[in-house]
Design a protein with these regions (language model features):
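Primarily NTPase-proximal linker/entry elements flanking Walker-type ATP/GTP-binding cores
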Residues: 1-95, 102-122, 130-138, 143-147
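Conserved catalytic-core segment of NTP-binding enzymes
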Residues: 105, 125-140, 154-254
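Short glycine-rich anion-binding loops that position phosphate/pyrophosphate groups of nucleotides
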Residues: 150-152
Length: 254
């Protein structure tokens, strides 16, 4: 990615007669902005609400991936809240049957948001929980199924097979990877690992309010060709905002 930006910068300077330092700074800044905009535009996100509403068949199934600690549970709750505000009903599948208290955390949010939740036994089959949630959505005419999954800190072969099985059985319309923007290179490694072993369609970045620049967005767009569709900017339910490339570029150069 840095090679592309430097090449663009070099091309923008070739043949230019510049007399003042201010002019050089402006040319460099404009070139950098243009390069970043091109990277983001090629992998622009999409409007999930429109995507769901345009799909004729119910339910729209979304599976969430992410290691422990990235804010996956809270992100699912925020997305459920956002969908509800847009007149879209949802049901949550607590398919993390591995981590202690995972289902209780989702149950807390589901109760506060007045959204149905399907739970399973700890140590039980995550795919079965997800399957039950989809069937429940069909019988109750619910628009969207939000499927939580296990995410151990050190992703292993057993977890990969478990997640693959969830995907195989649920046939999701969308696979979202949740990443912590503060994790830097670790987040990028997680993104590569999930892409190489399971696959996903889009990213939600959390804790962006605490991240100075959010450079991982560029790496995701350029290296992995994955769009960031939402940003988590706080702990409240309404602290989930669509990713805006213009806002991101301004933030980099402020």
């Amino acid at each position: 990615m840095s090679e592309k930006i430097l090449e663009d910068l070099k091309n923008s300077l070739v043949g230019k007669k510049v007399s003042r330092t201010e002019e050089i700074e402006k040319i460099i800044t404009d070139s950098l902005k243009k390069s970043i905009e091109e990277i983001l535009t090629k992998n622009r996100g999409f409007d999930l609400v429109k995507e769901i509403k345009s799909k004729g068949k119910k339910p729209y199934v979304i599976v969430f991936f992410g290691v422990n600690g990235v804010g996956k549970t809270t992100t699912i709750a925020k997305l459920a809240y956002m969908l509800k505000k847009n007149g879209i009903s949802s049901i949550i599948a607590a398919s993390d049957t591995f981590r202690a208290a995972a289902q209780e955390q989702l149950a807390y949010h589901a109760q506060k948001l007045e959204i149905p939740l399907v739970r399973g036994k700890y140590g039980g089959d995550p795919a079965a929980v997800a399957y039950d949630a989809i069937n429940s959505a069909k019988s109750r005419n619910i628009d969207v199924v939000l499927i939580d999954t296990a995410g151990r800190m050190h992703v292993d072969a057993d977890l990969v097979e478990e997640l693959k099985r969830v995907v195989r059985i649920t046939k999701p319309d969308l696979r979202i990877l949740v990443l912590d923007s503060l994790a830097g290179n670790d987040a990028l490694e997680q993104a590569r690992y999930f892409e190489n072993n399971i696959g996903y369609d889009a990213v939600i970045l959390t804790k962006v309010d605490a991240d100075a620049k959010g450079g991982i967005v560029l790496s995701l767009a350029y290296d992995l060709k994955k769009p960031v569709i939402y940003l988590g900017i706080g702990q409240e339910y309404d602290n989930l905002v669509p990713f805006d490339p213009d806002w991101f570029i301004k933030r980099i150069f402020q």
